[in-house]
Amino acid sequence: IDALTFYPLNKHTSPEDISGYLQPLVGGASMGVISEAGCPAVADPGADVVAIAQRKKLKVVPLVGPSSIILSVMASGFNGQSFAFHGYLPIEPGERAKKLKTLEQRVYAENQTQLFIETPYRNHKMIEDILQNCRPQTKLCIAANITCEGEFIQTRTVKDWKGHIPELSKIPCIFLLYK
């Protein structure tokens, strides 16, 4: 690992910096994108690296690894034939409530599982917003720390979650809605 070079990558990394990071790849070296949590390039700044690499016509090879999106669908008991991942929902309360109601409508209208994530320190607020804005009979799966020690994956109705919110601050979570 000492022979490796690591570059910082976050929402503040400029396209110019990313292009510079890709110079070894342009020169024929192999490179990889890793993520501290989640799947690189899916709701992740790694997508910017891949987009620039594609524009430069560089070879991009995705590697198989655990994906909280697929694993949470598998463990939820929800529709795995039709699902949609929405990444991060709006932070502003009114916009978030509107988005949650829209996703819930899609559950019932399209028979489609709806998935989304939140920054770990806002997990509790997300759960509160789901419980406040979704129908009591709508099912919510909370999948946290997937593939890690302390993994937590449970599916209950919104009504059954009320009064039983787990402590999930600072833990990566994915939330799924279904009927």
Task: Give, region by region, the residue ranges found by the protein language model.
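Short, hinge-like loop/turn segments at secondary-structure boundaries
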Residues: 1, 50-51, 76-81, 133-134, ...
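Class I S-adenosyl-L-methionine
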Residues: 1-59
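A contiguous loop/helix-start segment that scaffolds small-molecule binding in enzyme catalytic cores
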Residues: 3-6, 26-30, 108-179
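A short acidic, often aromatic-flanked loop/helix-cap motif at beta-alpha or helix-coil junctions
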Residues: 12-17, 91-94, 122, 147-151
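Short, well-ordered secondary-structure micro-motifs
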Residues: 19, 44, 72-74, 95-98, ...
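General beta-strand structural signal in soluble alpha/beta enzymes
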Residues: 35, 60-65, 116, 142
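Gly/Ser/Thr-rich loops at beta-strand to alpha-helix junctions
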Residues: 38-41, 68, 121-122
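Class I SAM-dependent methyltransferase SAM-binding "motif I" and its flanking Rossmann-like core
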Residues: 44, 48-106
